[in-house]
Each structure stands twice: as structure tokens, then as C-alpha cells.
């Protein structure tokens, strides 16, 4: 039996060896075709190989037979597939791909939908060739600076002729574009949906032309529009008022001329007004009965009182409200907003330390706004009375920030730690808290993930260490001085010598990594630089005194 098995294995090995020798001959035949041309006979046996054929790619053996170079797979890809690949690349990679061949250059230009250009006066010479290559642009950004002459009306209209499918337009620092340029541009680009202007030279006529021509406009942002003066005409509503969802006005001298547009935008969802002069109470009173779909309101440094807040409270669907440095707003206006806007989720208040918004308004917020998830109080002085009401009633409160408050101490912080169960992020800045309040966070707020403490002199590194031991997964970002800062008065002669501030020691105590903020780095660097300069000044003064005493003794 063993002899039979051995003879059988020996025959099998012999067959395998014969096959290997035959296949080697076929490989030699494939690798050295020049020998066959000299009359050398080829092997009769040739191993059959299964060839793969793709419905998209042709048979590679037929096209590459006898070729020494590897087959180019990408050449057989359709333009649509290559365009999809290019869309997933970065701008730098797209530039490199455009240098490969003319076909890639054409496809790269066709798949570019966003184009950002430096809008100088010499751009007009390259507009035809530039937009012939990039003929599928839907988002266009034109930027210029004060040092150079910007793009003119003729060049601006020339661009619109070649970009009729444009949906987004952003102009920054283009004072040479006038009302005529905007009118000509909007005649050719009627599909605009998002428009943003900053530091441009056109005025009311250009804005009205935009609103009357681009009927599908959804977002409008205007900043420092120089053509709108004190005696400007009214803007809007226009045909685009029905489709507008976002309006943002920044740093306008006569922003009240947009009142017809605001009152005519029935579907307006987001309203942002930043640092615009003039009385806004009348504007909001005209808007209150006509616009009811507003969800988000941002108001910063504008002249508005409780009358304006009362008018805005008619929009019962408001979920986000930012009141930043509006000193004429008081607890009365905030209470009316809280009573009528019960869906409020985010509330940011910067009281500018005027003490006009405090416990009374915040208690009303706690009473009606149960869905509150984010609360930011800057320059407001809440006490335990209002904070306890908020953390007890607003059970979904996840983010809380208390900055620049003189009344938020350890008592208030202990109340937050005890009753704010859903809190995930806490920020305390420039408040009179100590290590006792920080220790209380270790026993409360079970869902807390991140704590940020800045410019709180009573908090030391020891308190942060103890918090880390109790809550290992908690990220703590601490910016506390090692030694108490000596306060000094500043008189006519400048800062006194004893008013030396020591640089704070930045301590980050996470078990999970956390990047420190750039502002804290810059402030710490400035403090170190000031301390070193003062130390050098003192050393120089001592050297001078020593040299004088030596000269006198001699």
C-alpha cells in the first residue's frame, strides 16, 4: 500500500514539473519576441488564461498586444466619471491635474463651481479667456483692497454675460462698482440666491434693481454700503421679498431705509442687525404685524429700547435671541419676549454692565422658556434667586456662560452644580468664585464635559487639581494667576511702579486633549513682555545709580 502511494506521488510531481517547463517556455516566448523573429521555433503548448472583459473598458489584451508601456486605464474613463473624481480633490490638486493634458484642463475647468478672484482693474483683460475655461461657475467671489484700483462696471457686467447660471455672489471692497454695474449684472444673472456686499460704492438704485430682478433671492447681507446716505430713498420690498429668508445688515449709517424690505419679507427666518446707527424702534414696530416667521434674531449695538423688544415679541416662533450691548433694553422688554416667545432655545445677553437686565427678567425667562438649551450672560449681575429658577425649570439647559458678573460667586456656582443636571459645558470668566465653588462641580452636574475658567482670581491650580481627581473625564481649561494681582491706579504720569502684573499660568487639566485659545495666548505673551520690559528698566536704573555713586566717591 505504501509503495503504491509513493509511486502515485512521484507521477504527480513529474506532471507538475513538465507543466512548469512548458509554461516557462511560453513566458520566455512572451518576454523575448525578437528571438522568434530570427526563426526560432515556439513551444506548441500554451497555457490558457482567462481574460477579464469590462462592459466599460475594452479588452486590454487586444489594445495592448505587443506594447511595452503599461495600459492607461484613465484614458478610457468618460468625462463624467473624471469630473466626479476631480470634485473630491482640493484646489491645489486640481491645479496640478489641469497641467497633465488638454482633456484634463477642460474637465477641471468644467467641474469648478466656485471661483474667487482678486478684483483689480486689470482683470478686464483676462475675463474672456478666464470664463471660457471656467464656464460652470455658480459661486463667485470678487475681492479688492484699498491700495489698488478695483474692478469697474464694464468688467463687472462682462463677467455677468459669461456667468448666467450664477447663484451666489460676494463683493468685498469694490467701491468702483456703481448702481449701473449692479443693474447690468442683475439683468444677466437672474438666478441669484445668496448675495453679500461689503464696502461697495453703489446705493439704493442698485439694491432695488437686485430685489426687483432676482426673484429667487434667499439671503442678503449688506455691510458698509457707501452709496446709502442720510437722505437715501427707501429700499424694497421688490419681487424678491417673498423668497427672502435671511437679512443681515452691518455698519450702515441709514439702515432704516431697509424698513420696507423687512416688513415685506413675509417668509423671513433670520434677522441680524449689527452696529447700525439710527432709531430702530419704529422699524420694528412697522414689522411686528407683518412678519411672523422669524426664528432667529441678532441685535448688536443698535439704538433700541423696550418698545422694539415689545414689537419683536409678536414673533412668537423666535428660538434664538442675541441682545448684545443694547443699553436701553430693560427687564420689562425681556419679560415680554419671554412670555410670548416660549420656544426660546438660545439666549445671549450682553448687558454692558448697565444693570438694567437682572433677576427680574431672568426669572420670567425661567418661568416661560422651558426649552432653553443655551444661556450666555455677559455684563449681567444675576444672583442665586434667578439662577436657581433657571436651572430648576429649564431642564434641557446644556450650555451656560457667565462672564463679567460681580454677583456670581461660590453660592451661585454650588446651586448650579446641585440642580443643573443636563449641563454639558460651563464657562465662567471674571467672576468672584474660589476653589470652593470649583470643588462643588466635582460632586454635581453628572453630564458635565467641559469647564472653562478665566480671569477668576480666587481659583488656584490646587482647586483644579482636586476637580481633576474627582472627575477624570472632565476637560478643565484654567487660566488663573499664580499670585494675586496688585491693583494700581493710573494717573497723569502713567502707571505706578507697584502696579506690576505677573503673567498668569495657563493650566489645562484634561485627560482628553484641549487646545488653548489664541486670545489667552496673546494676553499671556503681552503680560510676560510687559513684565520683562519693566524688569529691564529697573536693572538699567540700578546700574545708573551705581555709576553715579562711584563717580562721586572718586
From Swiss-Prot:
<feature type="repeat" description="LRR 12">
    <location>
        <begin position="456"/>
        <end position="480"/>
    </location>
</feature>
<feature type="repeat" description="LRR 4">
    <location>
        <begin position="205"/>
        <end position="224"/>
    </location>
</feature>
<keyword id="KW-0433">Leucine-rich repeat</keyword>
<dbReference type="InterPro" id="IPR036047">
    <property type="entry name" value="F-box-like_dom_sf"/>
</dbReference>
<dbReference type="InterPro" id="IPR006553">
    <property type="entry name" value="Leu-rich_rpt_Cys-con_subtyp"/>
</dbReference>
<dbReference type="Pfam" id="PF13516">
    <property type="entry name" value="LRR_6"/>
</dbReference>
<feature type="repeat" description="LRR 7">
    <location>
        <begin position="326"/>
        <end position="351"/>
    </location>
</feature>
<dbReference type="GO" id="GO:0004842">
    <property type="term" value="F:ubiquitin-protein transferase activity"/>
</dbReference>
<dbReference type="InterPro" id="IPR032675">
    <property type="entry name" value="LRR_dom_sf"/>
</dbReference>
<feature type="repeat" description="LRR 3">
    <location>
        <begin position="174"/>
        <end position="199"/>
    </location>
</feature>
<protein>
    <recommendedName>
        <fullName>Putative F-box/LRR-repeat protein 8</fullName>
    </recommendedName>
</protein>
<feature type="repeat" description="LRR 2">
    <location>
        <begin position="148"/>
        <end position="173"/>
    </location>
</feature>
<dbReference type="InterPro" id="IPR001810">
    <property type="entry name" value="F-box_dom"/>
</dbReference>
<dbReference type="InterPro" id="IPR001611">
    <property type="entry name" value="Leu-rich_rpt"/>
</dbReference>
<dbReference type="Pfam" id="PF12937">
    <property type="entry name" value="F-box-like"/>
</dbReference>
<feature type="repeat" description="LRR 9">
    <location>
        <begin position="383"/>
        <end position="404"/>
    </location>
</feature>
<feature type="repeat" description="LRR 8">
    <location>
        <begin position="354"/>
        <end position="379"/>
    </location>
</feature>
<feature type="repeat" description="LRR 1">
    <location>
        <begin position="119"/>
        <end position="144"/>
    </location>
</feature>
<feature type="repeat" description="LRR 11">
    <location>
        <begin position="430"/>
        <end position="455"/>
    </location>
</feature>
<feature type="repeat" description="LRR 5">
    <location>
        <begin position="250"/>
        <end position="275"/>
    </location>
</feature>
<feature type="repeat" description="LRR 6">
    <location>
        <begin position="301"/>
        <end position="325"/>
    </location>
</feature>
<keyword id="KW-0677">Repeat</keyword>
<feature type="repeat" description="LRR 10">
    <location>
        <begin position="405"/>
        <end position="428"/>
    </location>
</feature>
<feature type="domain" description="F-box">
    <location>
        <begin position="71"/>
        <end position="117"/>
    </location>
</feature>
Amino acid at each position: 500500500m505504501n509503495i503504491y502511494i509513493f509511486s502515485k506521488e512521484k507521477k504527480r510531481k513529474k506532471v507538475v514539473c513538465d507543466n512548469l517547463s512548458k509554461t516557462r517556455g511560453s513566458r520566455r516566448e512572451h518576454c523575448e519576441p525578437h528571438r522568434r523573429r530570427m526563426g526560432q521555433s515556439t513551444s506548441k503548448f500554451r497555457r490558457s488564461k482567462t481574460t477579464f472583459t469590462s462592459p466599460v473598458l475594452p479588452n486590454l489584451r487586444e489594445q495592448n498586444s505587443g506594447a511595452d508601456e503599461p495600459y492607461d486605464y484613465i484614458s478610457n474613463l468618460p468625462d463624467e466619471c473624471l469630473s466626479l473624481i476631480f470634485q473630491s480633490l482640493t484646489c491645489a490638486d486640481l491645479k496640478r491635474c489641469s497641467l497633465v493634458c488638454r482633456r484634463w484642463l477642460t474637465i477641471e475647468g468644467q467641474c469648478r463651481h466656485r471661483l474667487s478672484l482678486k478684483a483689480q482693474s486689470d482683470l478686464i483683460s483676462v475675463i474672456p479667456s478666464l470664463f471660457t475655461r471656467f464656464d460652470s461657475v455658480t459661486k463667485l467671489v470678487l475681492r479688492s483692497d484699498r491700495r489698488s484700483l478695483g474692478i469697474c462696471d464694464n468688467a463687472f457686467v462682462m463677467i455677468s454675460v459669461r456667468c448666467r447660471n450664477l447663484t451666489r455672489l460676494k463683493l468685498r471692497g469694490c467701491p468702483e462698482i456703481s448702481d449701473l454695474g449692479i443693474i447690468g449684472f442683475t439683468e444677466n444673472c437672474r438666478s441669484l440666491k445668496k448675495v453679500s456686499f461689503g464696502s461697495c460704492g453703489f446705493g439704493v438704485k442698485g439694491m432695488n434693481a437686485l430685489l426687483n430682478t432676482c426673484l429667487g433671492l434667499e439671503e442678503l447681507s449688506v455691510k458698509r454700503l457707501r452709496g446709502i446716505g442720510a437722505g437715501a430713498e427707501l429700499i424694497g420690498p421688490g419681487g424678491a421679498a417673498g423668497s427672502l429668508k435671511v437679512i443681515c445688515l452691518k455698519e450702515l449709517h441709514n439702515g432704516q431705509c431697509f424698513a420696507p424690505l423687512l416688513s415685506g419679507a413675509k417668509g423671513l427666518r433670520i434677522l441680524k442687525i449689527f452696529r447700525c446707527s439710527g432709531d430702530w424702534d419704529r422699524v420694528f414696530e412697522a414689522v411686528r404685524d407683518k412678519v411672523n416667521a422669524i426664528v432667529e434674531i441678532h441685535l448688536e449695538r443698535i439704538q433700541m429700547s423696550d418698545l422694539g423688544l415689545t414689537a419683536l415679541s409678536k414673533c412668537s416662533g423666535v428660538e434664538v435671541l442675541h441682545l448684545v450691548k443694547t443699553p436701553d433694553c430693560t427687564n420689562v422688554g425681556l419679560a415680554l419676549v419671554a412670555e410670548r416667545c416660549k420656544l426660546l432655545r438660545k439666549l445671549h445677553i450682553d448687558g454692558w454692565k448697565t444693570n438694567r437686565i437682572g433677576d427680574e427678567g431672568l426669572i420670567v425667562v425661567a418661568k416661560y422658556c422651558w426649552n432653553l438649551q443655551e444661556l450666555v450672560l455677559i455684563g449681567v449681575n444675576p444672583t442665586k434667586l434667578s439662577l436657581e429658577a433657571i436651572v430648576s425649570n429649564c431642564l434641557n439647559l446644556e450650555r451656560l456662560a457667565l462672564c463679567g458678573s460681580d454677583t456670581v460667586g461660590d453660592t451661585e456656582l454650588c446651586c448650579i452644580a446641585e440642580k443643573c443636571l443636563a449641563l454639558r459645558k460651563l464657562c465662567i470668566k471674571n467672576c468672584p468664585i474660589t476653589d470652593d465653588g470649583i470643588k462643588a462641580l466635582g460632586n454635581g452636574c453628572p453630564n458635565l464635559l467641559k469647564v472653562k475658567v478665566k480671569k477668576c482670581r480666587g481659583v488656584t491650580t490646587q482647586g483644579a487639581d482636586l476637580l481633576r481627581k474627582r472627575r477624570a473625564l472632565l476637560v478643565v481649561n484654567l487660566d488663573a494667576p499664580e499670585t494675586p494681582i496688585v491693583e494700581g491706579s493710573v494717573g497723569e504720569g502713567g502707571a505706578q511702579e507697584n502696579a506690576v502684573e505677573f503673567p498668569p499660568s495657563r493650566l489645562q487639566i484634561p485627560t482628553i486633549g484641549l487646545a488653548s485659545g489664541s486670545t489667552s495666548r496673546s494676553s499671556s505673551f503681552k503680560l510676560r513682555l510687559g513684565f520683562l520690559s519693566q524688569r529691564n528698566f529697573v536693572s538699567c536704573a540700578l546700574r545708573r545709580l551705581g555709576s553715579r555713586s562711584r563717580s562721586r566717591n572718586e
